[in-house]
């Protein structure tokens, strides 16, 4: 990989379609897989050792590193490429057969081994988080549909089986205009918005709601991210779609001191706006379902609604501060004397966020900050597309829960490994004879990898 100094720290567009042998070897040497290999050897016991566990593990990884759609294609390349066999550790030994790798994938997907594969992913992400100060500050989450086939004897499998899922797209009136159905799993992700690096993932049956996976995802992400001195955690914002708009999720984020960027679901059928709690009919301040505050000009012949000026989130008070829009923007309002009286600053309204965490988040939905931050949610969609299309998570070539969980977890390990390689890669100045520079982050990651070796 040739990365320029002007490229992003994680230059995903620089990934090679056909990685060089140097890149493959660096990635294989980077993975902290000693515990996994020890557990696999212990599971094999005194059985036949025609193909050592380390070789099977490396061949299993090569399928995803080299982006082969099937294991047969990967084995065919190993047959005709002696240099690649040397990288995989098969200088003189025979090449495994396809059924050897199929059985290995089933063993790799067993819960005790799958936990160690997930531990490799967490260690790689923790290295990145320790070296990159802003990794995990702004996070986005989403889920994706993955097609899978279940086991013929599901009662013998300890992992969840795939089932049917359905996603409907509706209009504002609630009419279904499009529906998507699939049989398989739902892939949940938490991704850093800026760097497009996956911080946590979870695989659930397709019928599982998104909100049920958020607590586990958040806990997994907080475990791999360093905790600042204030003890509040590194994550500051979490962007999600309407699937995460429920009271339990907002309460969980409030306890973790994370600002939600979640679009609200339309649940009010009859009334477009309501009075603030504690306000009677004499008040001219109302709010809509999204939590946006408005004030009414009641002096004019026809009442006129104006959007109140948002002045910020008062963290110490736990309130959202709003001000008279006429005084803030400098225009004349017929209700100025009635609302503001002798006040120079104008009428001020403070709303306690605790009144309704869904309705009044620390970053109101009708603000430019919310709009800007919420656009970062597209990062998780790009990571989902990279996982499904670039590395083939949705190829549908796996049968059984064990194999599919091993399949997806291996893809995430490769994703985390390439993220480390991209951050560690030397940067070229752009000219053919220009010097190569190693950034501070690259040196930190290199030292961490050498210390773990």
Placement of each model-derived feature along the sequence:
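Polybasic low-complexity intrinsically disordered regions
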Residues: 101-255, 261-265
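Basic, short loop/linker segments at the boundary and entry of helix-turn-helix/winged-helix-like folds
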Residues: 17, 21-62, 66, 100, ...
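Charged, often Cys/His-bearing segments associated with DNA-binding zinc-finger transcription factors
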Residues: 1-38, 427-453
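Short amphipathic alpha-helical "interface-anchor" segments enriched in bulky aromatics
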Residues: 78-79, 274-317, 354-403
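DNA-recognition alpha helix
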Residues: 71-89
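Major-groove recognition helix of helix-turn-helix-like DNA-binding domains
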Residues: 88-107
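Basic, amphipathic alpha-helical segments enriched in Lys/Arg and hydrophobic/aromatic residues
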Residues: 372-453
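Long, low-complexity, polar/charged, intrinsically disordered or flexibly structured peripheral segments
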Residues: 316-362, 366
């Amino acid at each position: 990989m040739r990365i320029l100094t002007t490229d992003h720290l994680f230059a995903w567009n620089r990934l090679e379609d056909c990685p060089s042998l140097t890149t493959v070897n660096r990635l294989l040497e980077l993975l902290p897989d000693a515990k996994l290999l020890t557990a696999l050897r212990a599971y094999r016991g005194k059985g036949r050792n025609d193909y050592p566990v380390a070789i099977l593990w490396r061949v299993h990884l090569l399928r995803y590193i080299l982006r082969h759609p099937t294991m047969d294609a990967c084995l065919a390349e190993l047959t005709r490429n002696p240099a690649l066999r040397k990288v995989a550790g098969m200088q003189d030994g025979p090449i495994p057969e396809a059924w050897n790798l199929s059985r290995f994938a089933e063993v790799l997907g067993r819960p005790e081994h799958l936990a160690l594969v997930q531990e490799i992913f967490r260690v790689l992400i923790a290295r990145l988080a320790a070296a990159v100060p802003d990794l995990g500050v702004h996070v986005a989450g989403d889920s994706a549909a993955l097609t899978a086939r279940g086991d013929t004897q599901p009662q013998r499998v300890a992992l969840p089986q795939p089932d049917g899922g359905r996603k409907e797209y509706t209009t504002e009136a609630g009419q279904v205009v499009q529906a998507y159905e699939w049989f398989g799993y739902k892939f949940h992700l938490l991704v850093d918005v800026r760097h497009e690096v996956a911080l946590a993932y979870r695989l659930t049956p397709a019928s599982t709601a998104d909100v049920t996976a958020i607590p586990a995802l958040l806990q997994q992400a907080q475990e791999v991210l360093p905790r600042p001195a204030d003890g509040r955690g590194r994550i500051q914002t979490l962007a999600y779609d309407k699937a995460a708009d429920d009271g339990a999720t907002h309460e969980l984020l409030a306890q973790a001191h994370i600002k939600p960027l979640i679009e609200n679901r339309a649940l009010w059928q009859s009334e477009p706006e309501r009075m603030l709690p504690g306000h009677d009919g004499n008040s001219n301040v109302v709010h809509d379902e999204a939590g946006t505050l408005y004030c009414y000009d009641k002096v004019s012949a026809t009442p006129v609604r104006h959007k109140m000026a948002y002045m910020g989130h008062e963290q110490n008070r736990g309130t959202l501060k709003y001000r008279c829009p006429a005084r803030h923007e400098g225009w004349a309002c017929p209700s100025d004397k009635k609302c503001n009286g002798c006040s120079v600053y104008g009428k001020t309204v403070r709303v306690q966020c605790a009144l309704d965490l869904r309705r009044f988040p620390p970053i109101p939905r009708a603000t430019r900050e919310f709009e800007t931050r919420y656009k970062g949610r597209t990062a998780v969609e790009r990571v989902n597309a990279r996982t499904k299309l670039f590395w083939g998570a949705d190829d549908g070539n796996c049968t059984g829960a064990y194999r599919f969980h091993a399949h997806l977890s291996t893809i995430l390990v490769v994703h985390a490994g390439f993220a480390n390689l991209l951050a560690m890669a030397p940067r070229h100045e752009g000219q053919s004879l220009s010097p190569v520079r190693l950034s501070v982050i690259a040196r930190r990651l290199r030292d961490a990898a050498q210390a773990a070796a």
